């Protein structure tokens, strides 16, 4: 993979170079010392992935991510001194289009095979699989849907998701009568913090989905592990390692397919901004079962990958700008409740 480094600290750049050199198939394409340079380099010499620091002079990592995604979209991995100390900026960068985040390896660890360089390499490998993926979704068997459970809104998001989710959730009323379950492509290390972060922007309670959780009307559950979230035929949430070959964990396709075959009430599917194709086939499975499905439009998507794939295969009942998705959900659920 051709990799661009954006970091103003020489020691950090050297540490990243040494970690990248551990893999023969990776090479450093260029190094930028601030966000402005990074944007110019991405336009002139597009990399496969950018390793983006957060704190830099002139233009910081969040602003640089936003500008790159507007001018020369590519995969961006936030690599910063301490992810845990910069969670707000990390979520903001992910909302702008970054795919994931990891701590910067130290120079000493960069010479070894300790966890720090391996964590970075694992993230790069994961992004590589996503870029190469032509994922096919597996539809688990389940009984024919019947009535008896509340309306469920199943939402999938990836790059740009945190900002899109914030906008969608804050537009829903406190008495929203449906259950909401979200699968956002995010490492489990950030899931609890993201649930708390989203909880601060909505009138609905946002919690992580645990093994055995049950979707409830007026509440939001967020997938919280690196395994796949699924609904059982009894409407109970759980996690599974299978299928193992999916490029992103948790997989939106796996969850949407389980909703299509396992949820016994009415359901709506929403596929938001994101890179790749995850969620498109699952959304189509939901639509085939009679669910109303929505894909975010190109103009309001930070990364028009997943919703584009859904639109291309006819998976979406409607393709909407972000600010129209919440009103449409409210209207559709009101219509369903009158039936």
UniProtKB/Swiss-Prot annotation:
UniProt xrefs under Pfam families: CheB_methylest, Response_reg
UniProt domain CheB-type methylesterase: residue ranges: 141-336
Record keywords: Chemotaxis, Cytoplasm, Hydrolase, Phosphoprotein
Protein role: Involved in chemotaxis. Part of a chemotaxis signal transduction system that modulates chemotaxis in response to various stimuli. Catalyzes the demethylation of specific methylglutamate residues introduced into the chemoreceptors (methyl-accepting chemotaxis proteins or MCP) by CheR. Also mediates the irreversible deamidation of specific glutamine residues to glutamic acid.
Biological process according to GO: chemotaxis
TM spans (from-to): none
Enzyme kind, highest EC tier: hydrolase
Domain of life: Bacteria
EC assignment: 3.1.1.61, 3.5.1.44
Matching CDD domains: CheB_Rec, REC_CheB-like
Sites bearing 4-aspartylphosphate, chain numbering: 53
Cross-referenced InterPro entries: CheB-like, CheB_C, CheY-like_superfamily, Sig_transdc_resp-reg_Me-estase, Sig_transdc_resp-reg_receiver
Residues forming coiled coils: none
Reactions that this protein is recorded to catalyse: [protein]-L-glutamate 5-O-methyl ester + H2O = L-glutamyl-[protein] + methanol + H(+); L-glutaminyl-[protein] + H2O = L-glutamyl-[protein] + NH4(+)
One annotated Gene Ontology cellular component of this protein: cytoplasm
Similarity comment text for this entry: Belongs to the CheB family.
Subcellular location: Cytoplasm
Modified how: Phosphorylated by CheA. Phosphorylation of the N-terminal regulatory domain activates the methylesterase activity.
Major location (coarse): cytoplasm
Active site per database record: 158, 185, 278
Entry domain remark: Contains a C-terminal catalytic domain, and an N-terminal region which modulates catalytic activity.
Gene name as annotated: cheB3
Domain Response regulatory intervals: 2-119
GO molecular function: phosphorelay response regulator activity; protein-glutamate methylesterase activity; protein-glutamine glutaminase activity
Keyword match Hydrolase: yes
Name assigned to this protein: Protein-glutamate methylesterase/protein-glutamine glutaminase 3
